[in-house]
C-alpha cells in the first residue's frame, strides 16, 4: 500500500503529523533458536526491546524494534557521524566517500545499551544509536510514508468539514499558517478567506508560504477570456479535469487561484483527488496501475500568439511513485497537452490506453467531483501534483489572478512549523 488511509487512523493523526509512523515496542522472538548452530547471533535485552545482530562477510544484520535490517559496510562507514566525518553545525558530510575502501569490514563490533560501536581497520570508531538505524534503514523507510494524506471523494471531503483559514490569521500568526498547511498537506487543497480582491494582496498571501515560481506565464498571472495566450484557460469554454504544466520537466507544485470579479453565470471550479482515483485503480487493476507508473510520455505546449513564442516539453509517467515504499507522489494527467505517443512500443500501447481509460473512468465518476464557486475574497491553493482541476463554461466578464509556488519552499515552511512533509 503506497499511502496510509488516515481517515481510519484519527487517533494517531497528531503523531503522524509530528513524527511519522510510530513503531510499537514489541518483544522479539528468540531468533537464535530458529537458526542453525553454525550461525552466531549476538543478543542483548533492554527493558522494552531485544536486539540481535550478526556480522556477515559482506554486510551487517540487525534485528531490533520489530524490524530486520541489513547494512552494507561501506554504508556504515560512509554515514559515520563523528566530528571528523560529519559537520553537525552545517549538517553536511565531511568524509570523502571516494576514499572509503569498497571492501572495508569492521575489526570489531560491540553494543552498549542502545548504541552500536564499529571499529574500522584504521582504528576509527563509528557509533550508531539503534533507533537512528531503524529510522534510516531501507527496511525502516519502506514502512514509513513521506507525507501523510487523507484521500477523498466529494462526500468524504464535505463530511470532513475542513475549515478555511482567515486571511489575517494566515498572514500574522504561525498558528493560522500551520493550520492552513496541515489541511493542505492532508487534502491537497486549502482555502483562505477574507482576502482583499486584488492581485497585490493575492501575491502577499502566496509569499507568506513560498517563493513564487516564475514561468512562461510570468510571476503573477492575471487572465480573462480574451485568449491573450495560446491556452484554452484563456477562453469561456469548459475545461476537463487536468493537472497544470505537465509539459514542464518538473510540473509546478502548487497553484493559487483568486477570482477577482465575475459578472455572469457558470464558471464553477472542479476539483478531483487524483490520488483517490489512482488508489481505486490500484485496488481494481494493480497491473494497470503499475503500467501507468512505468511508461514515460511526452507532454508539450506550443504557443505562437502575439509576442509569446514557446515550445515546452515534459517527459514522465502518468503516475510517479517512490520505489522503496510504493508511495504515490505525483500524477501527471492532461489530455489537452499530451503529445504524440512515440515513447511506447507497439505491443505496450494498447495496454497503456486500457490503463489510461481505467484511470479516466475513476477520475470522471460524479461522486469524485467536488465543485466550488470561486468568489472575490476566497483564495484557493491546489496541490498540482495531486489534485486535478477544471471548470464549467461561463458567461460574462471574469477576472482571475494567481501564481505557481515552488513546492520545495512550501514543504520547507511546513517542516519548520513541525509538520511532516
UniProtKB/Swiss-Prot annotation:
The keyword Transit peptide applies. One of its GO terms (cellular component) is mitochondrion. It is found in: Mitochondrion matrix. Binds 1 Fe(2+) ion per subunit. The modification N6-acetyllysine is found at residues 179, 236. Changing residue 369 to D: In AUTSX6; uncertain significance. Fe cation binds at residues 242, 244, 389. Its main location: mitochondrion. All isoforms, but isoform 8, are widely expressed in adult and fetal tissues. Isoform 8 is restricted to heart and skeletal muscle. The keyword Chaperone does not apply. Pathway: Amine and polyamine biosynthesis; carnitine biosynthesis. InterPro entries: AlphaKG_dependent_hydroxylases (IPR050411), GBBH-like_N (IPR010376), GBBH-like_N_sf (IPR038492), TauD-like_sf (IPR042098), TauD/TfdA-like (IPR003819), Trimethyllysine_dOase (IPR012776). Keywords: Acetylation, Autism, Autism spectrum disorder, Carnitine biosynthesis, Dioxygenase, Disease variant, Iron, Metal-binding, Mitochondrion, Oxidoreductase, Transit peptide. Its cofactor is Fe(2+); L-ascorbate. Its EC number is 1.14.11.8. GO terms for molecular function: iron ion binding; trimethyllysine dioxygenase activity. It holds the Pfam family GBBH-like_N. It comes from the Eukaryota. It catalyses: N(6),N(6),N(6)-trimethyl-L-lysine + 2-oxoglutarate + O2 = (3S)-3-hydroxy-N(6),N(6),N(6)-trimethyl-L-lysine + succinate + CO2. Residues 1-15 form a transit peptide. Belongs to the gamma-BBH/TMLD family. Converts trimethyllysine (TML) into hydroxytrimethyllysine (HTML). It is linked to Autism, X-linked 6: A form of autism, a complex multifactorial, pervasive developmental disorder characterized by impairments in reciprocal social interaction and communication, restricted and stereotyped patterns of interests and activities, and the presence of developmental abnormalities by 3 years of age. Most individuals with autism also manifest moderate intellectual disability. AUTSX6 patients may respond favorably to carnitine supplementation. Homodimer. This is Trimethyllysine dioxygenase, mitochondrial.
Amino acid at each position: 500500500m503506497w499511502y496510509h488511509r488516515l481517515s481510519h487512523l484519527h487517533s494517531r493523526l497528531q503523531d503522524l503529523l509530528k513524527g511519522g509512523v510510530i513503531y510499537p515496542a514489541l518483544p522479539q522472538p528468540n531468533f537464535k533458536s530458529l537458526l542453525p548452530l553454525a550461525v552466531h547471533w549476538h543478543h542483548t535485552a533492554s527493558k522494552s526491546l531485544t536486539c540481535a545482530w550478526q556480522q556477515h562477510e559482506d554486510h551487517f544484520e540487525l534485528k531490533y524494534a520489530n524490524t530486520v535490517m541489513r547494512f552494507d559496510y561501506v554504508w556504515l562507514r560512509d554515514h559515520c557521524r563523528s566530528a571528523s566525518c560529519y559537520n553537525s553545525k552545517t549538517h553536511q558530510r565531511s568524509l570523502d566517500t571516494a576514499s572509503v575502501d569498497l571492501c572495508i569490514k569492521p575489526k570489531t563490533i560491540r553494543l552498549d545499551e542502545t548504541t552500536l560501536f564499529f571499529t574500522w581497520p584504521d582504528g576509527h570508531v563509528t557509533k550508531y544509536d539503534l533507533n537512528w538505524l531503524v529510522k534510516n534503514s531501507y527496511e525502516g523507510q519502506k514502512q514509513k510514508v513521506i507525507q501523510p494524506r487523507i484521500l477523498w471523494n466529494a462526500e468524504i471531503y464535505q463530511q470532513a468539514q475542513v475549515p478555511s483559514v482567515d486571511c489575517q490569521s494566515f498572514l500574522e500568526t504561525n498558528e493560522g499558517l500551520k493550520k492552513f498547511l496541515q489541511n493542505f498537506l492532508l487534502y491537497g487543497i486549502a482555502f483562505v478567506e477574507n482576502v482583499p480582491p486584488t492581485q497585490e494582496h493575492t501575491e502577499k498571501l502566496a509569499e507568506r508560504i513560498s517563493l513564487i515560481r516564475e514561468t512562461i506565464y510570468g510571476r503573477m498571472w492575471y487572465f480573462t477570456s480574451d485568449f491573450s495566450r495560446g491556452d484554452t484557460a484563456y477562453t469561456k469554454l469548459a475545461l476537463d479535469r487536468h493537472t497544470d504544466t505537465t509539459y514542464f520537466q518538473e510540473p509546478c507544485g502548487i497553484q493559487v487561484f483568486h477570482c477577482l470579479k465575475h459578472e455572469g453565470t457558470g464558471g464553477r471550479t472542479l476539483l478531483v483527488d487524483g490520488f483517490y482515483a489512482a488508489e481505486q485503480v490500484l485496488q481494481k487493476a494493480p497491473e494497470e496501475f503499475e503500467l501507468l507508473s512505468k511508461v514515460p510520455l511526452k507532454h508539450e505546449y506550443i504557443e505562437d500568439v502575439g509576442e509569446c513564442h514557446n515550445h515546452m516539453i515534459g517527459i514522465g509517467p502518468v503516475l510517479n511513485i517512490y520505489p522503496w515504499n510504493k508511495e504515490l507522489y505525483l500524477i501527471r494527467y492532461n489530455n489537452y497537452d499530451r503529445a504524440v505517443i512515440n515513447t511506447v512500443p507497439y505491443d505496450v500501447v494498447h495496454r497503456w490506453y486500457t490503463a489510461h481509460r481505467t484511470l479516466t473512468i475513476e477520475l470522471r465518476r460524479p461522486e469524485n467531483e467536488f465543485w466550488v464557486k470561486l468568489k472575490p475574497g476566497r483564495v484557493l491553493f491546489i496541490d498540482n501534483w495531486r489534485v486535478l482541476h477544471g471548470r464549467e463554461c461561463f458567461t460574462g466578464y471574469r477576472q482571475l489572478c494567481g501564481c505557481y509556488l515552488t513546492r520545495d519552499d512550501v514543504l520547507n515552511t511546513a517542516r519548520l512549523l513541525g509538520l511532516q512533509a
